């Protein structure tokens, strides 16, 4: 019985000692983070897709804080770009670059008759929009898919295709900038 109590006491003392060392190290080696980077990172969709040219959302937030273009986040879309513009105090820009028109939103589509159930696409999807099991066909949850295109390359049978999102009453947007509204002048 004393051996058990001794072992428990030794482990408790070791835990206390390592806790004190870790606490000291956390205070001694603390790195101040830029609050604007944290705010920008919170606005980004956290898909870690890399379409902006950076390996994830945090590096893109750091680049934004250093003056990079605010319109590179394709999965975040126009709404995210406008929130970033408001936070940074700059004018909104067209998505994808000043010379580019707004990109057509696409989602992944799996040709289920060709799918071998290897799960490589599931592992590549940063938002878990692909469901399926090993050696069973997979499918994409279209409402969750951001169109990041990361699932296409790992597929060994090339059964994944990026297709445009069909226009429905849920996603249709009226281009009010190009609509002429007749005005009757009352005197």
Curated annotation (Swiss-Prot):
Cross-referenced PROSITE patterns, in alphabetical order? 4FE4S (PS51656), 4FE4S_FER_1 (PS00198), 4FE4S_FER_2 (PS51379)
Give binding positions for [4Fe-4S] cluster 1.
49, 52, 57, 73
Q: Where is the 4Fe-4S domain?
A: 32-90
Q: Which domain of life is it from?
A: Bacteria
Asked if 4Fe-4S is a keyword of the record, the answer is: yes
Which Gene Ontology MF annotations are present?
4 iron, 4 sulfur cluster binding; electron transfer activity; metal ion binding
Q: Which GO terms describe its biological process?
A: electron transport chain
| Names of the cofactor(s) | [4Fe-4S] cluster
- Share what the entry says about its subunit structure, partners included: The complex is composed of six subunits: RnfA, RnfB, RnfC, RnfD, RnfE and RnfG.
Protein name stated in the entry = Ion-translocating oxidoreductase complex subunit B
